Amino acid sequence: VELLRDAISRETAYGQGLVPAYAESLRQVFLDAGFPPEALTIVPYGETASLVLRYEGDGSSGRRPILFSSHMDVVPADPESWLRHPFELQEDETFFYGRGVLDNKFDVTLLTTLFVWLKESGFVPNRDLVIAFTGDEESFQETVQQLARDYRDLVDAEYALVVDGGGGVLNDANEAIQFQ
């Protein structure tokens, strides 16, 4: 919960210039878990940045990496229009509240926690696993384009899983009929 609390406290909306500091804080979490410095790359882009982590596997699968993509930025939030402060994680017996809980700092926190747990458990994947946290999904998505164009070697993968907030629609029987 502390990692999510830290994430929510960071106002990483477009134009705030705070995504690079958030990327650096995540980089430090990965370093503290035992990932080597050369496995982590922060790629600056204007006032924002991307963070790429390569979790090196033993190569026994003979396959290319799996890429996990998510984003560190959020939509702007005016505290005056919120019932709770958007940049303070709050919780009750059922829910967490704060800007980014659904889109998308929970998912960034989840991936970070998962990779840290795997590393600290001594897990060695049979191929490389790559995280690409981008910095401007909520605005221009230029960091994704930059990674694909200029840093292909960091993010090239057999396939990608986009871990992002979303939603869906249930029918009267509580069965999912649409995903977003």
Regions found by a protein language model. Give the residues of each.
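Acidic/histidine-rich catalytic neighborhood of metal-dependent amide-processing enzymes
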Residues: 95, 102-180
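Acidic/His- and Gly-rich active-site-bordering loop/insert found
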Residues: 1-99, 120-127
